[in-house]
Amino acid sequence: MVRGRISRLSVRDVRFPTSLGGHGADAMHTDPDYSAAYVVIETDAEDGIKGCGITFTLGKGTEVVVCAVNALAHHVLNKDLKDIVGDFRGFYRQLTSDGQLRWIGPEKGVVHLATAAVLNAVWDLWAKQEGKPVWKLLVDMDPRMLVSCIDFRYITDVLTEEDALEILQKGQIGKKEREKQMLAQGYPAYTTSCAWLGYSDDTLKQLCAQALKDGWTRFKVKVGADLQDDMRRCQIIRDMIGPEKTLMMDANQRWDVPEAVEWMSKLAKFKPLWIEEPTSPDDILGHATISKALVPLGIGIATGEQCHNRVIFKQLLQAKALQFLQIDSCRLGSVNENLSVLLMAKKFEIPVCPHAGGVGLCELVQHLIIFDYISVSASLENRVCEYVDHLHEHFKYPVMIQRASYMPPKDPGYSTEMKEESVKKHQYPDGEVWKKLLPAQEN
């Protein structure tokens, strides 16, 4: 039962020094320190339940997101949770349409990352109070209630409330069977853990061999910095995994449009399923041009992890600019905005293959993609969710992978709650880890 008035909101800057091991390095982000703005909301319900939310960053700039969260806090404090979820669309619009803050958005950039962190905490709180994981909260929700959580502004030319309701009502058919299937088998995943650009060939081989031993059949490799290096590394991985297993590539926005086509034409020999983020995430027509050139080579376009909002996704779908749509649980406006994108993808029959990894992204997005299969897409064809084996030990309810699949979480909430000792240790700049590292970095 939903209860309580939100009485406190706190936010902390939490950073993990992943750059020291080359973890997460790609063609554009060469030395990331995986980080998060970590939000905790409390109520006056005196039940001890807290809502925890995060948004993912790469180190520097996390303090800016923290500042934006604090700027949004007045929209949340002293609100009854019952009133928020009773008019979630209205609350979402209140957060995203602040008459002054929207000028540094609107619905994009730092202020939208902050919005995601706050809303993720609200969803975590709601699900915990209901005693359900978020995916189950969504699956059990009446289609009309789900629709009421979505802001359809700017997308009604593609998806109306009536369209969304029709999709969700159709999704009720066979829902119980699909839920049983997920609980038994899990949602298929692929691994990005073995092929970061910061890794040596020996490390790549070692991690790839271990992934094969662990049962992984789908692998992603980072490309885009140096063509000859890409050719060598892709050859290593393809030789190790064999011709039957799936290989994906990710350029992390490195190329201009003609360069993307030329580069991928040379990497086509390694038979990638897709090239991810081949160019600027804002260049819808550029993606469409690349798609038109590469689809005849059997290479699809995947993008979305840095798409600002539902409008960019709408245009990518309209322009036939992608074959695989990658939602992000912290880039878009939390569950609310992701619902609209899942529904648009269903309408266009484009498979959703979420971006994950980072700090807590796997923990969050598993809820969305499991809900998508059970209640929206009803298909696993060409669908797979990213998995990166980093930093899960810092979460109270970490993801569970079995047989290279995400097993549906059973603990109440959004799986966003971090261990307090981890937060204190990695808080920037005064946590134990950074008190040791910062003086050394300055010398």
From Swiss-Prot:
Stated family: Belongs to the mandelate racemase/muconate lactonizing enzyme family. ENOSF1 subfamily.
Assigned EC number: 4.2.1.68
Protein species of origin: Homo sapiens
Disease annotated for this entry: Dyskeratosis congenita, digenic: A form of dyskeratosis congenita, a rare multisystem disorder caused by defective telomere maintenance. It is characterized by progressive bone marrow failure, and the clinical triad of reticulated skin hyperpigmentation, nail dystrophy, and mucosal leukoplakia. Common but variable features include premature graying, aplastic anemia, low platelets, osteoporosis, pulmonary fibrosis, and liver fibrosis among others. Early mortality is often associated with bone marrow failure, infections, fatal pulmonary complications, or malignancy.
Protein name: Mitochondrial enolase superfamily member 1
Positions bound to substrate: 24-26, 34, 220, 252, 276, 305, 355-357, 386
Source species, domain of life: Eukaryota
Post-translational modification: Could be sumoylated.
Cofactor(s) listed in the protein's UniProt record: Mg(2+)
One of the GO BP terms on file: carbohydrate catabolic process
SMART domains listed in its UniProt record: MR_MLE
Co-factor remark: Binds 1 Mg(2+) ion per subunit.
Gene name of the encoded protein: ENOSF1
Cellular location(s): Mitochondrion
GO cellular component: mitochondrion
Residues modified to Phosphoserine: 148
Record key words, sorted: Dyskeratosis congenita, Isomerase, Lyase, Magnesium, Metal-binding, Mitochondrion, Phosphoprotein, Ubl conjugation
GO molecular function: hydro-lyase activity; isomerase activity; L-fuconate dehydratase activity; magnesium ion binding
Catalysed transformations (reactions): L-fuconate = 2-dehydro-3-deoxy-L-fuconate + H2O
Function in brief: Plays a role in the catabolism of L-fucose, a sugar that is part of the carbohydrates that are attached to cellular glycoproteins. Catalyzes the dehydration of L-fuconate to 2-keto-3-deoxy-L-fuconate by the abstraction of the 2-proton to generate an enediolate intermediate that is stabilized by the magnesium ion.
Predominant place of localization: mitochondrion
